[in-house]
Amino acid sequence: LLLGMLLAGAIVFAGKYEDGMTERMKVVEEKFQPDLESGSIDGMLNASYKLTAEWEKELNNVYNLILKKLPAKEKSKFKAEQERWIKSRKAAIKKALADEEDGPRMALFGAAGTEYEMTKARVLELAKRYDKMN
């Protein structure tokens, strides 16, 4: 019951862009779910990469929307912030790839998961920011 109330509260307070994006991506994630749960290593990795690519499209979209709204003096600051985030994501992926404790295949899964989770989190962060601007 408490979880339901928290979810309802989050939905009420979420902004219009975030709501639309969340609904769009829910459909996309459901599309890839069978492959992610298939048990086939190649199928799972391929689905993960494709899903991350879809989140990347959303990231680029919301990034550009924010950029259009920002005053000129804030644009360079925002671009630098995004570049720092991209570098941190690359470093996290590289670290995950280097972690072969459970073997190289698991390192690939770890890297794919890291890229997906970080990209999704950044999209949600920027969507909230964009909604606050409107």
Regions of interest found by a model, annotated:
Residues 9-11:
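N-terminal signal peptide c-region/cleavage motif recognized by signal peptidases
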Residues 14-134:
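N-terminal alpha-helical modules
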Residues 1-6:
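Sec-dependent signal peptide recognition
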